[in-house]
Amino acid sequence: MQTSDITTLYRPVGPAELELIKQSGWTKFPPRLPEQPIFYPVMNEQYAIQIARDWNVPASGSGFVTKFAVRTEYASKFEIQNVGGEIHNELWVPAEELEDFNSNIVGQIEVTKEFK
């Protein structure tokens, strides 16, 4: 969802990443690992649910969908990539820009769904 000032994004995460988000006070995403050059929140909850349920649960025993808002003016500098079907849109943020991305999050990151 997008208003003129903020864009709502979703991020499917496993339990380890969720714990790091919690430790940040629900205000930022943790740095990417060296083998993860892109941070890619997704553009809709349906796609985030699919990843959390179908990928995170088998990989780590549980999956969570997080929802957060980011300043539209900032988010618009990144490309939206379609990686499959109609719902499979991701915002591709280079890992080295994640700190700036985090500083443009409005409010807190919230968990909207949990899968086990």
Residue ranges and their predicted role:
Residues M1-F39, Q46-K116:
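Conserved NAD+-utilizing ADP-ribose enzyme module
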